[in-house]
């Protein structure tokens, strides 16, 4: 399999994306965000974008080292960061992490559920353990994070919950039964929770990105990276949702590269 680039090895975001991100500077001043999957890929980009917009950020993820790296970068932006290694499938551990983050930074105003795992395989080759892991992380993990931050948001009668799903949460593909099932589940979970929380003043938003250049995307020859979204493009969508007026709810945001629509690739 072709080697996949690290977060540091990927090219910077397009200038238009960088310019758009810069326009959000200061828009989240005084706010606290919690991000899962914060050490790599979309979670990393989102954490940095939230900090650049003025938020203090609690960084949750499996591995301490990448979380510490992101925390250092956030400190360089003049914001506070709290790095806490946690497995989102462990509900008690997630609740403990949320409490620790609230003690360190304050209660969450924004929570971004970005942690996810892959599970691409034809059904006859899909290992049951792999399927269970995908459902546990990509669906149950989201529920665990939302439950952990929700009490404080209920007290405040406001908050933003952003779920990073996938365009595969609306679009099935052959060879992706396990992953697609988990993302359909993530979308359904989030939209159901959105209906529950309208009256509480809490917005639930689902971002459905497709073809994002992250380390675990299929090899470059299967999807040319120059034609893919950059993680910062997804982070930009999160900032847009996080700064919407409280009375506005945009439940679903499909995000794909224009080139994919014009010249699809398989």
Predicted regions and their residues:
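Conserved glycine-rich cofactor-binding loop
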Residues: 32, 39-41
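The beta1-alpha1 cofactor-binding region of Rossmann-like NAD(H)/NADP(H)-dependent oxidoreductases
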Residues: 85-96, 128
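Substrate-binding pocket helix/loop in short-chain dehydrogenase/reductase
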Residues: 122-123, 127-135
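C-terminal helical subdomain
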Residues: 199-202, 206-207, 222-263
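Conserved glycine-rich Rossmann-like NAD(P)H-binding loop of the short-chain dehydrogenase/reductase
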Residues: 55-69
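Active-site helix of classical SDR
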Residues: 146, 182
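Residue(s) in the substrate-gating loop at a strand-loop-helix junction
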Residues: 166
């Amino acid at each position: 399999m072709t080697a996949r680039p690290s977060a540091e090895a990927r090219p910077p975001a397009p200038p238009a994306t960088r310019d758009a991100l810069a326009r959000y500077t200061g828009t989240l001043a005084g706010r606290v965000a919690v991000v899962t999957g914060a050490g790599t890929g979309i979670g990393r980009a989102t954490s940095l974008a939230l900090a650049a917009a003025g938020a203090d950020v609690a960084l949750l993820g499996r591995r301490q080292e990448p979380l510490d790296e992101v925390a250092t970068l956030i400190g360089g932006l003049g914001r506070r960061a709290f790095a806490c290694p946690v497995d989102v499938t462990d509900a008690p551990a997630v609740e403990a992490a949320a409490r620790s983050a609230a003690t360190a930074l304050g209660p969450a105003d924004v929570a971004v559920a970005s942690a996810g795992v892959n599970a691409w395989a034809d059904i006859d080759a899909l290992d049951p353990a792999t399927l269970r892991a995908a459902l546990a992380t990509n669906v149950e993990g989201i529920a665990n994070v939302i439950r952990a931050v929700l009490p404080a948001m209920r007290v405040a009668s406001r908050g933003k919950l952003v779920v990073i799903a996938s365009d595969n949460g609306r679009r099935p593909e052959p060879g992706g039964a396990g992953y697609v099932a988990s993302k359909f589940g993530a979308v359904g979970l989030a939209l159901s929770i959105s209906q529950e929380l309208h009256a509480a003043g809490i917005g639930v938003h689902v971002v459905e990105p497709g073809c994002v250049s992250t380390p675990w995307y299929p090899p470059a020859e299967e999807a040319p990276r120059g034609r893919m979204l950059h993680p910062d493009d997804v982070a930009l969508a999160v900032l847009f949702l996080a700064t919407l007026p409280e009375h506005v709810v945009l439940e679903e945001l499909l995000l794909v590269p224009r080139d994919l629509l014009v010249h699809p690739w398989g």
